[in-house]
From Swiss-Prot:
This is Ribosomal RNA large subunit methyltransferase M. Keywords: Cytoplasm, Methyltransferase, rRNA processing, S-adenosyl-L-methionine, Transferase. Belongs to the class I-like SAM-binding methyltransferase superfamily. RNA methyltransferase RlmE family. RlmM subfamily. The active site is at residue 305. Its EC number is 2.1.1.186. Catalyzes the 2'-O-methylation at nucleotide C2498 in 23S rRNA. GO terms for molecular function: S-adenosylmethionine-dependent methyltransferase activity.
Amino acid sequence: MKNLFLFCRAGFEKECAAEIQQRAGELNVGGFVKANNNDAYVVYQCFEDDAADTLVKQLPLDSLIFARQMFAASDLLVDLPENDRISPIVAALSDVSKAGEVRVETPDTNEAKELSAFCRKFTVPLRQHLKKSGSLLAQENPKRPIIHVCFIGPGRAYVGYSYSNNSSPHFMGIPRLKMAADAPSRSSLKLDEAFGQFVPKEEQEERIRSGMNSVDLGACPGGWTYQLVRRGMFVSAVDNGPMDEKLMETGQVKHYREDGFRFEPQRKNIYWLVCDMVEKPARVAELIEAWAINGWFKEAIFNLKLPMKSRYKEVTAILETMQTILKENGVSDFKVQCKHLYHDRDEVTVHLWLRPNTAWN
């Protein structure tokens, strides 16, 4: 297959396109992008047949900022007959053998999601035919490739596969999180999603545990503080504004009515630093850099608000500058990840982990 299909948020196709063009080039996989505004997907068409397999194997999905999910894809199947959509799809997947799962999806747009009921019903007979053809195993297997069938409109679909070790575990790349009734704001879901995105399940018990000390800069009214409290942490909530009363009643939160840019922790035993402030992204990055250089935290999750134009260029420039500044100031052992999360809008979420191979005292 020569196409790479990438899911993204509607309105961010240009950013996703610019990113995959650059990243594919770094792997010497030439091609060009096909993208339309508000389609919520991008297709990277490789010049060489089967080059998409190189990308789904060698380009880590977690290293892409704007793509939620990706798969090696066929050319667009069009005019699928209403009386037999299955046969052309099975034929297009003839080179896929012994996959462990099939997902029938749509892009994340209101128009495409009108097909979601059809996709659910269609999955059952399609699964049976794929098992008969040998493209799909009789039993689901999480270690085998995943077959993707993405309907972008009635009778129009891209089909292909991803590898389970380089694929989102979520349908359409979207985690299904529930808004807690007592959470102070919807922003709470951003940190909840970020923990799932940046900290593997098997490491969460060690790295996100009860009793840890944390700081929330720009905490009011407490959406992110809520997620820290829910996980049993003690939180220094820094904001001139008021905090949610129920959060304060837990006894786990100490409210500092201060400017988040001027606050300095009294004790240097902070594991998690979180920050979701409506500020210029470069200024927030400088703040996190200062905390990192001072060694005031172990892991940080923070949001960078995106400009209206050149969003990919701006984000990559800020992240490159951050890494340069940290290294110039003696902080050389760290890991940075960045993702445009489902619950993000005009922002991206960044994870910075200092000394990832060194235990926390």
